[in-house]
Amino acid sequence: MSVLDNVMTGRLTQMNSGFISQALWRGKAEREEIENREICERVIDFLEIQSIRKTPVSRLPYGLKKRVELARALASEPKLLLLDEPMAGMNVEEKEDMSRFILDVNDEFGTTIALIEHDMGVVMDLSDRVVVMDYGKKIGDGTPSEVRNNQAVIDAYLGVSHD
């Protein structure tokens, strides 16, 4: 499946035309297809993957596959997007690229991002507000600066001496 086809699957929940209309490619189905393709092309342009839009996703390196995953999610035009470990397995350059895109998602698409991430540098750089959990209990909540200086967070993540 190509990058474009993969991103287009993110639009499936937005399709309203019936089976017959789609099969005959008439009227409403044709208009929907054009509109959906335009939305997907906008997302592809935003994530700077135009040059690989016809490439099978299976041939892409890991970092680009993660970008395609983000593109597919954005194609559905969510109001809230939950990203669970979006930087997992990425090298430094890939993390920088993904961070840049995540920072711009709200401005470009009006989508709020809820991020679950263990790379605290990424969390502090990307977040307006941070909530820190330790074994299922909330131990910190505030701006990155407030959380960075929260003693409970410091103890949980750096350890505390029990002498």
Question: What are the residue ranges of the model-derived segments?
Answer:
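Glycine-rich phosphate-binding loops of nucleotide-dependent enzymes
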Residues: 1-163
